[in-house]
């Protein structure tokens, strides 16, 4: 890649970031709360599944 292509790539990247920042908006309290609850629930489910798998493999002796 030539240096001109790299510079143009960074300029486009910066323009894309600026566009995202101008379009983005702060979520309201209810939407944030729902996202937080769903994220924590999924994290807990994955953690419990990992614990169960680890326990089963330990009991089997693998």
Swiss-Prot record:
It comes from the Archaea. The chain crosses the membrane at residues 40-60. GO terms for biological process: intracellular protein transmembrane transport; protein secretion; protein targeting. Keywords: Cell membrane, Membrane, Protein transport, Translocation, Transmembrane, Transmembrane helix, Transport. Essential subunit of the Sec protein translocation channel SecYEG. Clamps together the 2 halves of SecY. May contact the channel plug during translocation. GO terms for molecular function: protein transmembrane transporter activity. InterPro entries: Prot_translocase_SecE_dom_sf, Translocase_Sec61-g, Translocase_SecE/Sec61-g. It is found in: Cell membrane. The keyword Transport applies. GO terms for cellular component: plasma membrane. Component of the Sec protein translocase complex. Heterotrimer consisting of SecY (alpha), SecG (beta) and SecE (gamma) subunits. The heterotrimers can form oligomers, although 1 heterotrimer is thought to be able to translocate proteins. Interacts with the ribosome. May interact with SecDF, and other proteins may be involved. It is a single-pass membrane protein. This is Protein translocase subunit SecE. Its main location: membrane. Belongs to the SecE/SEC61-gamma family.
């Amino acid at each position: 890649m030539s240096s001109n292509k790299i510079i143009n790539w960074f300029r486009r990247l910066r323009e894309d970031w600026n566009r995202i920042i101008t379009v983005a908006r702060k979520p309201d309290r209810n939407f944030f709360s729902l996202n937080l609850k769903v994220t924590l629930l999924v994290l807990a489910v994955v953690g419990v599944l990992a614990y169960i798998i680890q326990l089963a493999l330990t009991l089997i002796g693998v």
